[in-house]
From Swiss-Prot:
Residues 49-72 bind DNA. The lineage of its organism: Bacteria, Pseudomonadati, Pseudomonadota, Gammaproteobacteria, Enterobacterales. The gene is slyA. GO terms for molecular function: DNA binding; DNA-binding transcription factor activity. Residues 2-135 form the HTH marR-type domain. This is Transcriptional regulator SlyA. Homodimer. Keywords: Activator, DNA-binding, Repressor, Transcription, Transcription regulation.
C-alpha cells in the first residue's frame, strides 16, 4: 500500500494555514503577513529584503507583494541601503509592535487549540520526525 504521508502533511499545512487566515481576518492580516512580520521582528534590525526572503525560505520576488501590503498598512518601512543602492532595508514601524503582540496571542491560542489533547511527548516525537524527513529531503536534493 502506498503511503499518503506527503499528501497528509500537505493537507495539514493547508488547513492549519486556512484556520490562521480565518483567525487573523478581523485584524486584516493573513498567515503570510504574520510569517513576514514575525521574521522581521526576530531578525536583527534593518534586514535586507534578500536576507528576509532567505530567512522565510522564499524567493525575493514572492516577498515583495507581502512587503508592499505591510507597508500600505503602516507596519513596515523600506529604505535604500546606503552601501548598495539596489538593496532595500526593512524596518518595523512603531505601529507594528502592538499588532505583533496581538497576532502573537491569536497564533498562540490557535496553536494551543490545535494541539489540544496531544501530549508534549507526542509533539516532540512529531517534531523530531518532521525534522528527520526534512534532513532526508535536503540530503537527496544535494546528491
Amino acid at each position: 500500500m502506498e503511503s499518503t504521508l506527503g499528501s497528509d502533511l500537505s493537507r495539514l499545512v493547508r488547513v492549519w494555514r486556512a484556520l490562521i487566515d480565518q483567525r487573523l481576518k478581523p485584524l486584516e492580516l493573513t498567515q503570510t503577513h504574520w510569517v513576514t512580520l514575525y521574521n522581521i521582528h526576530r531578525l536583527p534590525p534593518d534586514q535586507s529584503q534578500i536576507q528576509l526572503a532567505k530567512a522565510i525560505g522564499i524567493e525575493q520576488p514572492s516577498l515583495v507583494r507581502t512587503l508592499d501590503q505591510l507597508e500600505d498598512k503602516g507596519l513596515i518601512t523600506r529604505h535604500i541601503c546606503a552601501n548598495d543602492r539596489r538593496a532595500k532595508r526593512i524596518k518595523l514601524t512603531d505601529d507594528a509592535e502592538p499588532v505583533i503582540k496581538e497576532v502573537t496571542g491569536v497564533i498562540s491560542l490557535t496553536r494551543s487549540e490545535i494541539l489540544d489533547g496531544i501530549s508534549t511527548d507526542e509533539i516532540a516525537l512529531l517534531t523530531n520526525l518532521v525534522e528527520r524527513l526534512e534532513q532526508n529531503i535536503i540530503h537527496l536534493q544535494n546528491k
